[in-house]
Amino acid sequence: MRTDTIAAIATGMCNSGIGIVRISGNEAFTVIDKLYRNKDGRKVKVSQSRSHTVHYGFIYDGDEKVDEALVLIMKGPHSYTAEDTVEIDCHGGILMVKKILEAVIHAGARTAEPGEFTKRAFLNGRIDLSQAEAVADVINATNEYALKSSVSQLSGSVSKRIKELRSRILYQIAFIESALDDPEHISL
């Protein structure tokens, strides 16, 4: 698996009030420290703050002020991907969100492949395969039943049931092996 730092637009490609650019990987904090300045325009290492904090300021690309933003810091493994993660909440115009993503790429990240954040969450043990599949199902749900089912699967209901069945099967296998090894001491 590649361990580089990835970035992508997390919101849809449409004009809206807010757009989100997500960054994840070993250099996510290095990237944001190159781009972020506080409300007074001073460079501040937001990466040194506690996990799960929000910072108001501005995103710069070099000396050019790109946009006003909120920056969320999530230190791994306590993030969706279980890696260091940053979310930049900016104004949601398509052009603005693309400019923020370009600044992130200039600062050292690469554009994520479709589904790569979820792939990393799976590979890092943050979610299991059933939950990874449920992410796509939640996104693509077209009715209430499909959405409810997908959310249940995302919360681990299918995985829990599989673990229960696995445990029961292993118990039965142990019972059968014991009966084969010493049939006189097994009562049915």
What are these regions (language model features)?
Residues 144-188:
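Flexible nucleotide-interacting loop at or near the entrance of a catalytic core
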